[in-house]
Amino acid sequence: MHPLQVCDPGGSQWCIDLSSDALIEIDHVTFGYDSSRTILNDLNLRFMRGQVTSVLGNSGCGKTTLLRLIGGVHAANKGRVVFDGEVIDVHNREQLYRLRRRLGMLFQFGALFTDLSVYDNVAFPLREMTDLPEPLIHDIVLMKLNAVGLRGAAQLKIAEVSGGMARRIALARAIALDPELIMYDEPFAGLDLISMGVAAKLIRTLNDVTGATSLVISHDVPECMAISDWVVLMATGGRIVAQGTPAELMASTDPEVRQFVRGEPDGPVKFHYPAATIEEDLGVAR
């Protein structure tokens, strides 16, 4: 055993490398929602501290499932998810509560409370998870809204804001507790070009200013390539096609990588879901 490794005292074959600068480690993780379909198969990934890492891939390849495993929503069928050297145990509620205070989540559709004001949406985690006095919460909320350019919208209702503004409000809420890890699930979905540019700039700026680690799940190649330190390309079944810097992936000659980053319709990734021939399904096969 390496002197900077901690291994399972029970004698199984896993070890955690304490010399690693990874905040999150996905260690031989296999997961499926039922026994008939495996979403992630023996997945190994490391998300480095202080970096923006984007995970790109086609729909259904397991990107959002990966976030759920990191957040302790689901337990891996095999393998381990490690957060800052600590193996996540979904059955340990005290641990989950403690670890979740250290992460922020921007959901794909915002998940804002429509009956609350912008201010109260951002204040919600501070009121629920801390004992801070209301005057201090007031100042924190205004600072977080100012960081996303919406301090002036604090008293608006959610029904009064645009989709792009709602995404920024959700981001302000996600960073309310100053998380070490910020996870973004499709942060650019449904945004116009200007709002998309604003969202991308915010992700990069907040990461650099706060020193957080950011994990971005997305289909949007140009935005992710512009803001990421590291990019992971996944395929169906949780298979890692490639990973590297944005420049390395853009220069790749691998046909599957080229097809995805260039949005080419023809290539190794097929349009049709596996099926019998159309002639067989229509009963006209010869």
Label each residue range with its predicted role.
Residues D178:
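Conserved catalytic motifs of ABC-family nucleotide-binding domains
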Residues L56-N58:
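The feature captures the beta-strand-to-loop junction immediately N-terminal to the Walker
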Residues K157-V161, M165:
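Conserved ABC ATPase signature
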Residues I88-G104, E134, L249-S252:
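ABC ATPase NBD coupling module
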Residues V87, E134-A153:
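Conserved ABC ATPase "signature" region
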Residues I182-D185:
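Catalytic Walker B motif of ABC-type/P-loop ATPase nucleotide-binding domains
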